[in-house]
UniProtKB/Swiss-Prot annotation:
The lineage of its organism: Bacteria, Pseudomonadati, Myxococcota, Myxococcia, Myxococcales. It comes from Anaeromyxobacter sp. (strain Fw109-5). Keywords: Acyltransferase, Cell shape, Cell wall biogenesis/degradation, Cytoplasm, Magnesium, Metal-binding, Multifunctional enzyme, Nucleotidyltransferase, Peptidoglycan synthesis, Repeat, Transferase. Gene3D superfamilies: Hexapeptide repeat proteins (2.160.10.10), Spore Coat Polysaccharide Biosynthesis Protein SpsA, Chain A (3.90.550.10). It is found in: Cytoplasm. Binds 1 Mg(2+) ion per subunit. This is Bifunctional protein GlmU.
Amino acid sequence: MSHSPTPLAAIVLAAGKGTRMKSQKAKVLHEVGGRPLAWFPTRRALEIGANPVVAVVGHQAEAVEAALAATLPGAPLRFAVQREQLGTAHAVLSAREALGRYQGAVLILSGDTPLLRAETLSRVVAARAGATLSLATMRLADPHGYGRIVRDPAGTPARVVEEKDATDAERALDEVNAGLYCADAAFLWEALSKVGSANAQREFYLTDLVAMAARAGGVVAVPVPPEEASGVNDREELARAGRVLLRRRASELMRSGVTIEDPERFDCDEGVEIGADAVIEPNVRLKGRTRIGAGCRLGAGAILTDAVLADGVTVKPYTVIEEATVAARAILGPFSRLRPGSDIGEEAHVGNFVETKKARLGKGAKANHLTYLGDATIGAGANVGAGTITCNYDGEKKHPTTIGEGAFIGSDSILVAPIEIGAGAYVAAGSTLTESVPPGALALGRAKQVTKEGWVARRKAEAQNKGAAEAAPAPSPADSPRGGRAS
């Protein structure tokens, strides 16, 4: 993290609606990498030491404020409301009160630029030291829609002209404004007070500051890659930005010792942590505050949300883990589901089509097949057979199930909570238990088996005889003992 050596504040412009998103939600609330768009420039400004950072909000102001406060807890954030959308200069001026008596450099950036790097912001801030204003520029093969950079005969930026106000010659220019500026606060407020709206859109353009700064003491242009500075205006651009962020993240992780088998099929939110020597198979999705320990292996199609995995955990394909904790060397899946509150112990096994919810499995405990464990505590070394169900809900309340260390639960057992199976106890397959079982005991909760030898043959013979009788023709009246004429 590179901090500015001089006082630095930042203003993030996040007031617009974003009509091209075709959404009821404000543009800057749309997410990439599990974060709202406005989070990215705000976070990058914080990374280079900006304090405070003022977010100018407008459309859905309360929701934008809440999203930034929730995703940047404890950060020196302030908020300013632009009640009327009168242009970018008006938006920046809306932040003046929030900055109070602050004197120093002010970095201005757009809230829809998730690809900006902290290093780029630092370059723009550093460039201002030799001028009244610094701004980022980029060269585009198709500059349509962007403000063009007009330079003087000496090659110094003289002004920015917006697309709708440009002449044909100016529209032919390929150097455009990237919407990232740095200026001294004193100059900024004085210049903004002089900006007018005599332009094609009748708006107060922030870009008018460039001409004012050129006259006051000079402007420095800082070239930046188009990929980095381009804003997000619609869903296609949102998706493209997301892929760029994922490629960056995959590259960063691989350089730190993580194996990602196919970086093009890797999906990871901002803030996810992955330890060295972890292996990520294709189509894994890592969300929220997930933490992956060293040496873990995540199988294809696994989805982890706010999960914490210790070192050496194996997650087989298509396992879903949400708000669960998994200890070292545990084995999960394939096709298992760990719901919130699950706590899986060291070397425990949770196998295919097993679902856990608020369940704790001790060291080496196993539930390998077709099982539901809800509100359950499973002791170390216990084995839960296929098809076992903990019936934790009575229609009104949840109840706990406790299975002691070394206990053995036979297949297709139903444990009706609240219930406790003692350490080392056995439950016979197919049992339905409603009472606790003492340690070391065997519990059978099923009907007694009855075997009837020869029953199948007798049943088949009866069926055949019945079928033959039903198929025989009915007797005619003449054949009846009462059917003839009396003599």
